[in-house]
Design a protein with these regions (language model features):
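Flexible coil/turn and secondary-structure edge motifs
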Residues: 71-240
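Hydrophobic/anchoring residues in structured secondary elements
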Residues: 14, 30, 97-100
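A short, aliphatic-rich beta-strand micro-motif
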Residues: 27-34
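Conserved beta-strand segments that form the floor/walls of ligand-binding pockets within enzyme
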Residues: 7-8, 32, 44, 76, ...
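Juxtadomain coupling helices with adjacent low-complexity linkers
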Residues: 46-72
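Regulatory sensory and allosteric helical modules in signal-transduction proteins
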Residues: 1-23
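Sensory-domain boundary capping and coupling elements
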Residues: 34-47
Length: 240
């Protein structure tokens, strides 16, 4: 599915699962999908024939319905270079989906080359969707803190720049409370503040396809994380 975004349709009244017709008599099936307080997707079938509903539309509707009623939750981690971070989270039992992209900058739909200049405000980021019955947000945040150098500002391994800053981005207040508790406990034990930023997710743009699952496609590719870090993810015990 395309990037999650809010879609505004002018001069049309929206009712979930109902037909909405614009002034140009353009027929649509519009399904606003609310996911913990925000629109996750809108199904928009552009056809003058109300009976037109193909296989692509059916699959899209199934995905939208899954997002709306499914138990999975979403969280976004900025952890330096996103190649290794994606591989790390994919190894965690209970993580059901990951994708890499750029988060919380001001440039709209940036390319990797644009983000690389450090002039877009974006951080390299991994979108993680997980099953909370198998792995908790608390455990994911603790794993994240063990994966990164949490006291290094704008630098992870040999990668340096604001695009490599560390952060956790959430889409609801309940998650913020959990993250604050975990991060606060970690900082208290360490006796100092971390460089990890905690913010609501303002935007996330999926990176180019060649960045997705990069280390699966390129097993010998660059990665700043050690093999021991990946073992930490692989051996994460299931939630009781």
């Amino acid at each position: 599915m395309e990037r999650e975004r809010t879609v505004i349709v002018p001069d049309v009244e929206l009712f979930p699962g109902h037909i909405a017709c614009s002034s140009e008599s353009r027929s649509e099936i519009v399904v606003p999908c609310w996911k913990r307080g925000r629109i996750a997707a809108v199904l928009d079938i552009d056809s003058k024939d109300l009976n037109t509903f193909d296989e692509v539309d059916r699959k899209y509707l199934e995905e939208v319905t899954s997002l709306l009623y499914g138990k999975e939750r979403d969280i976004w981690f900025a952890a330096g270079c996103f190649w290794g971070a994606q591989k790390f989270f994919k190894l965690v039992d209970g993580v059901v989906f990951t994708e890499v992209g750029f988060a919380n900058g001001w440039e709209i739909d940036p390319t990797y080359k644009q983000v690389y200049t450090d002039e877009t405000g974006h951080a390299e980021c991994v979108h993680v969707r997980y099953d909370p019955e198998k792995v908790s947000l608390e455990r994911l945040v603790n794993l994240f803190l063990n994966m990164i150098d949490p006291f290094s500002l704008n630098k992870q391994g040999e990668d340096e720049g604001t695009r490599y800053r560390t952060g956790v981005y959430y889409d609801n207040g309940e998650d913020r409370e959990v993250i604050e508790t975990v991060l606060g406990s970690f900082e208290n034990k360490a006796g100092r503040k971390s460089a990890v930023e905690l913010q609501p997710l303002r935007c996330f743009y999926k990176a180019e396809e060649y960045h997705q699952n990069y280390l699966d496609k390129n097993p010998g590719g660059y990665c700043h994380l050690s093999p021991a870090i990946f073992e930490l993810a692989r051996k994460t015990p299931k939630e009781q």
